[in-house]
Amino acid sequence: MLPLLRADVEAKTALARTMPADDLIERATGGIAMGTDAEISQVVLAPSYFCRPYNLITEYPGVRLFVYPVDLAPSEAGSPARELARLFKAIGDDTRLRILQMVGEREMYLQEIANRLGVTHVTAIHHLALLRAAHLVRSVERGGLKYYQLRPETVAQVGERLRDVMGAAQVGGR
């Protein structure tokens, strides 16, 4: 497992040289965006296999630590079939579909989502973590709250991604 974690650190270090810090954080965490009002001067990104699909976030004065999930099999991580399976698992639940509908209408914070669904905030966190891992939602901090937003670019790509995985010859043919 250590080689997997080292490889992820090397990959993120290389990305850090080519992309803005906010984009790197969002990519590593699967959709967490730091708000502009965060008083953070340093960010630490640390990969973990054990917290999947959750991110563990700890804050110290001026420093925020993101422990983010990585896949065990790096050869499959990011593969189209694996990502599509994660996406369909995420939308294969009526509660998560309702969440997508709600945040598609407007961004919402956690307790607001839980209240509208009639579930505990812990249950809402579970559903939102799966949706975030599938890149269907992102969370943005603002005013001390995390707001959840639909990622319309992922929704728009579902059909195309399924066709890619199935292969052009399989789609529409018998």
Question: Can you annotate each of these PLM segments?
Answer:
Residues 105-109:
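Short capping segments at the starts of secondary-structure elements
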Residues 110-111, 122, 129:
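Residues within helix-turn-helix
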Residues 134-142:
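Beta-hairpin "wing" of winged helix-turn-helix
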Residues 86, 97-99:
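Pre-recognition alpha-helix immediately N-terminal to the DNA-recognition helix
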Residues 1-61:
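DNA-contacting interfaces and partner/effector-binding or oligomerization modules
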Residues 83-91:
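Short amphipathic alpha-helical boundary/capping segments
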Residues 99, 112-116:
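A short acidic, leucine-rich amphipathic alpha-helix
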Residues 147-174:
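Conserved segment of winged-helix/HTH DNA-binding domains
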